[in-house]
Amino acid sequence: MILFLNGRDLQSVGVTSTGLETLDGNVSVTLLQDTEFLSLFNTEVDTGFNIISPVRDRFLFENEWEDTSVQVRESSSSWASGNQDDWTVWSVLGNQSWGGTGSGQDNDSLGLLFENSSDSGGSDGFGGGGWLWSTVSHVIVVWQVSDSLFSNDSGFSHSGNGVDWVVTLGGFTRQHNTVSTIQDSVTDIGNFSSGWSWVVSHGFQHLGSTDNWLTSQVRLSNQFLLDSQDFWGWDFNTQVTSGNHNTVSDLQDFVEVVNTLLVFNLDNDLDVLTLFTQDFSDGQNIVGGSDERSEDHVDTVLDTESQIFLVLFRQSWQIDIGTW
């Protein structure tokens, strides 16, 4: 683990761990093994650091501002706080940060928290990234790795057990608690969850549709999230809502999924044989129909007159003779 702190006129630096090795006020490059994170500006720094360990994993910490005094504590829990009258910019990168962004009391501060997936399997990936701009003269830059805005290189978290979290950005221009991160993120590609997010203009579609500007940057190339074409697929689960719900995993929602398949399954109906049972019961009413009508047959070939005489007079009808 190598940490370079870019600055001049350092007042005090306190290091209580053997893991941090180098402090140099003349360089502007912070290295994390083979990945380069470049600082674009050499600014005047009047800074005090108090970095507390143990830190059980490799991490990057960079602070860069002008004319301010701040005390920063970095430990495995990845919390940081600052108290100042002017302004400051702080960033925290940790492996398993479960609590959220650190809280700071200041009069005009901006903060940025990078954190990894909670089930990353020990991968050295970063859970997010972004640009932080303001009217004050400061720049925090994390250079892209493999053309990815969120630095999701396969060498870091490709072999991890989950996808990265979406982090929150900054605070407002008054004293307040900073915005918390997503609580129910998609931690495993097999367990989909949409969770609540408190990022302004978040626009995070359910299960991370790739049509969205945000999710298209956070997923890896071999991880399939819902796309618009998935809505034309067979047997789509209609009971997965876009709200805060439990993840769909294993056989937890198996019964519900089976029931909803009848809605979109437009193929041949396997229950078509039940129609024969209904037709058979209806046919019993007409198959053995009785013939109770009376009739008299008249043979028009032989003995026509005698047959007509019997037909006319057996019912005692009134007959007019000679009507020919």
From Swiss-Prot:
Q: What else is known?
A: Partially overlaps CDC19.
The identity of this protein, by name, is: Putative uncharacterized protein YAL037C-B
